[in-house]
A protein has these predicted regions:
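The −1 position to Zn-ligating cysteines in a subset of zinc-ribbon hairpins
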Residues: 51, 65, 90
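Sequence/structural segment immediately N-terminal to covalent heme-attachment motifs in c-type
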Residues: 44-48
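Extended charged
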Residues: 1-43, 57-61, 78-88, 92-191
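Non-heme iron-sulfur electron-transfer modules
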Residues: 74-76
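Local cysteine-cluster metal-coordination motifs and their immediate loop/turn environment
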Residues: 50-57
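Histidine-centered catalytic micro-motifs used for acid/base chemistry in nuclease
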Residues: 65-72
């Protein structure tokens, strides 16, 4: 993980999502929320440079999802279902793993850039010593629950980005745009 800056709310979000969604909730209080947010997925993806806010690797917008950081499935979060500030761009698999854990999972808008690093050549994600003591347990839980540390699917994806760099299919500047944590690990090796 690395820190992402919360994107600015789109100009027409208020009308198309917040008002429409909250009006729908008033009329359907006991029903699963209607998806008004997905029309803004391409915009959220673009604001995040098509990087999953959790795995920090490129995903095309059609493969990404809008994660409700505070789960839309919990009654106490219903007022946040149609709030832009509650949306994170995530790989579907990561979003599914996150489930309803909410604040047990670190928020990509609140972590610091140097809390995690990739170890090469294994491509495993580790916590650094810079993670504050008060956040270490959540950080460990986050990478375990979201399968970000060393699960087969994430290692395979990271190794492919690393291979592309090693075989000159992608330069370091290009890698920085597609898998910034791997680019950071390479820069660390080069210094």
């Amino acid at each position: 993980m690395m820190r992402f800056t919360p994107p600015a709310e789109p100009a027409n979000f208020e009308e198309k999502v917040r008002k429409a969604g909250n009006n729908w909730l008033v009329k359907n209080p006991d029903t699963k929320p209607k998806d008004f947010w997905s029309t803004f997925k391409p915009e959220l993806a673009k604001c995040c440079h098509n990087l999953c806010n959790y795995s920090v690797m490129f995903i095309p917008s059609r493969m990404g999802t809008i994660d409700h950081y505070l789960s839309k499935s919990k009654a106490q979060n219903r007022h946040l279902i149609y709030e832009w500030k509650n949306y994170r761009y995530a790989l579907q698999r990561v979003n599914s793993c996150k489930g309803t854990y909410d604040r047990q999972i670190l928020d990509p808008f609140e972590v610091e850039d140097n809390w995690f690093e990739i170890i090469l050549p294994s491509c495993q994600l580790i916590l650094t010593d810079t993670v504050p003591d008060g956040d270490r347990d959540r950080a460990k839980f986050t990478i375990k629950q979201l399968q970000l540390q060393n699960s087969e699917w994430v290692i395979e994806q990271r190794q492919e980005w690393y291979r592309m760099y090693l075989e000159n299919e992608l330069n370091l500047e290009g890698l920085e745009k597609k898998a910034p944590l791997i680019a950071r690990a390479i820069r660390k090796q080069l210094n």
